[in-house]
């Protein structure tokens, strides 16, 4: 009987390990034929993996037939997922694949809840698997630094399996608190339960990962990841050493001197933040401007937001309106850009899902933290540290837009819902649902997953064809390319880069009105002022000079330090017979200092100088 129980436990452990490991390996398979492969390959890989996870979840539910303890974090996740679903059906519109991913991540959450509830050590197996994924990423990163592996971005040497150093550093700092927890927890006393060899193996494994992560993290040059690492590891250390209790005792011993010690600590923190700010001052000022503009975008549609996927368009319009008021400083004009992300997930959620969506997201995370604080399991420190690192990193970056980082976040949320809750009130601990309900729910999740992932092969083929057509687009072969882009439009109309290329093809082939329509759709998705530049040129070709002027001015307001929109506006004035306006605008362009002096800028200024000559 004992051997049978051990065999069952081993089988469960292998199942949990394999299904967890699958979530951390699929993004290494890069299909280079896909357009935007650094993003789309991961997306289509996730579609395949979630199917495997769901089918295995159904099998586990039917084989084990175990009751499921429904907890408050589960309710928080359901509320958030339900709101996204209702918002997509009854709201102003959402980008389809973004809504699908939110729903699929809710399904993944409950699958991981089921897996982590299979047996008591399931949580430990999942956390060790996560650390293994962190080890692989650090080895991959060192391989890139030493030229053994190719980088995921031409401008950066270190990206891991990601497309730039930011998400790579974010992944490592979410793993780091878990590694630190086990470094503190693996001690010689473990020899009694597993022998000296097990202690040495575990100790060497976790300490090796810790040293590797700490060695490579500075090379990523991500200040947000450093802050997240300090916060996450600080939480783990505080829980392990019960620092709160020790600080109280220290305060009693120091008496009034404690205030001086606290003051010195605050000054040190201020100096630290000042150093981080001065390290990349323009970048920090740019983030601050983005947050200000995001706040203005939230004010435009405070409760429901603009819809998932439409952050770029809402941000671009809000930034143009801000610079049009002439309230901005010269530094703000200098650092303004056209970001794809808000670099603060809480503000971006506010822009896309409104205040209601932001509150529901914070509620779900807050309920998970509450569950951890009530837990009596020691692993709560590791999970809470990981959630803390994610939460801090989300203040300065875009982890909810990177599928691997969302998977780690969902894993932490699921583990928080699973960990033992003996300290909770009795009425909360008794909330369970029967095995038949679990099996029915697993079938429902399978049906939803099938509905959301069917026909994705057609979408994948569309991305492959787009990648092929981009070669002809780059060679300025527009006549045939425009017809192929028209065929791809139903599949790729939520991709701003595709809409921009399609709009340009239409413009180059003289289809100006249709080009304006396609580019206008792109302005809902992107903050790139080039959409308005091309629309302005199309309107000018149609002799709609008032519309062209409005487009060029909008592009100029969106990113004020760029000269190209003003150059186009000056040319349009001259071509339309508005010579006086043209001369005024030409002088403005000639006198304006560009952010980066290039041959193109010199040519534009030289051309306008010729226009000014009598």
Predicted regions and their residues:
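Conserved structural position within tetratricopeptide repeats
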Residues: 489-490, 521-524, 553-557, 591
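Alpha-solenoid helical repeat scaffolds
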Residues: 466, 497-501, 530-535, 564-568, ...
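Interfacial juxtamembrane loops and adjacent helix segments
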Residues: 152-156, 308-351
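Short coil turns that delineate tetratricopeptide repeat
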Residues: 493-494, 526-527, 560, 594
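Hydrophobic alpha-helical transmembrane segments in integral membrane proteins
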Residues: 273-289, 438-475
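Alpha-helical transmembrane segments of multi-pass inner-membrane proteins
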Residues: 12-27, 48-61, 77, 81-111, ...
């Amino acid at each position: 009987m004992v051997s049978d129980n051990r065999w069952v436990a081993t089988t469960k452990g292998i199942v949990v390990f394999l299904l967890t490991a699958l979530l951390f390996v699929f993004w290494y398979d890069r299909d280079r034929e896909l357009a935007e492969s650094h993003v789309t390959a991961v997306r289509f890989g996730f579609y395949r993996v979630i199917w495997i996870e769901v089918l295995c979840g159904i099998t586990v539910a039917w084989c084990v037939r175990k009751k499921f303890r429904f907890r408050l974090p589960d309710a928080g996740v359901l509320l958030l997922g339900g709101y996204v679903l209702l918002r997509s059906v009854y709201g102003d519109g959402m980008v389809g694949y973004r809504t699908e991913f939110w729903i699929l991540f809710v399904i993944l959450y409950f699958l991981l809840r089921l897996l982590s509830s299979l047996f008591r050590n399931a949580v430990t197996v999942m956390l060790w698997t996560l650390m293994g994924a962190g080890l692989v990423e650090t080895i991959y990163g060192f391989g890139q630094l030493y030229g053994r592996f190719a980088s995921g971005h031409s401008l950066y040497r270190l990206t891991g399996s990601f497309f730039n150093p930011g998400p790579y550093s974010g992944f490592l700092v979410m793993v780091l608190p878990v590694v630190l927890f086990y470094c503190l927890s693996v001690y010689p006393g473990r020899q009694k339960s597993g022998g000296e060899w097990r202690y040495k193996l575990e100790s060497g494994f976790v300490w090796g990962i810790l040293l590797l992560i700490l060695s490579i993290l500075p090379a990523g040059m991500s200040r947000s990841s450093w802050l997240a690492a300090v916060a996450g590891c600080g939480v783990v250390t505080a829980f392990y050493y019960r620092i709160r209790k020790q600080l109280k005792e220290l305060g009693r011993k120091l008496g009034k001197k404690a205030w001086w010690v606290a003051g010195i600590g605050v000054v040190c923190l201020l100096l630290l933040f000042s150093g981080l700010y001065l390290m990349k001052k323009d970048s920090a000022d740019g983030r601050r401007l983005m947050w200000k503009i995001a706040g203005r975008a939230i004010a435009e549609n405070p409760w429901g937001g603009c819809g998932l996927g439409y952050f770029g368009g809402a941000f671009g319009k809000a930034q143009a309106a801000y610079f049009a008021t002439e309230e901005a400083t010269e530094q703000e004009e200098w650092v303004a850009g056209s970001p794809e992300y808000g670099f603060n997930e809480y503000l971006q959620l506010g822009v896309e899902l409104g205040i209601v969506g932001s509150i529901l997201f914070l509620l779900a995370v807050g309920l998970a933290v509450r569950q951890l604080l009530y837990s009596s399991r020691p692993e709560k420190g590791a999970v809470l540290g990981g959630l803390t690192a994610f939460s801090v990193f989300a203040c300065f970056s875009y982890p909810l837009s990177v599928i691997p980082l969302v998977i780690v976040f969902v894993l932490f949320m699921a583990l928080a819902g699973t960990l033992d809750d003996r300290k909770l009130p009795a009425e909360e601990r008794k909330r369970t649902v029967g095995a038949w309900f679990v099996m029915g729910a697993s079938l429902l999740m399978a049906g939803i997953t099938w509905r959301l992932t069917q026909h994705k092969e057609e979408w994948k083929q569309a991305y492959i064809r787009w990648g092929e057509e981009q070669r002809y687009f780059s060679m300025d072969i527009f006549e045939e390319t425009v017809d192929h882009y028209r065929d791809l439009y139903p599949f790729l109309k939520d991709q701003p880069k595709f809409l921009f290329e399609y709009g340009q093809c239409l413009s180059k082939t003289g289809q100006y009105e249709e080009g304006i329509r396609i580019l206008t759709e792109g302005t809902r998705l992107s903050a790139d002022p080039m959409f308005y530049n091309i629309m302005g040129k199309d309107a000018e070709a149609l002799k709609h000079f008032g519309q062209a002027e409005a487009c060029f001015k909008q592009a100029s307001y969106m990113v004020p330090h760029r000269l190209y929109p003003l150059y186009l506006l000056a040319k349009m004035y001259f071509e339309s017979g508005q010579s006086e306006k043209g001369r005024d605008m030409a002088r403005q362009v000639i006198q304006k200092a560009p952010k980066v002096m290039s041959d193109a800028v010199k040519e534009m200024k030289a051309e306008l100088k010729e226009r000014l000559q009598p």
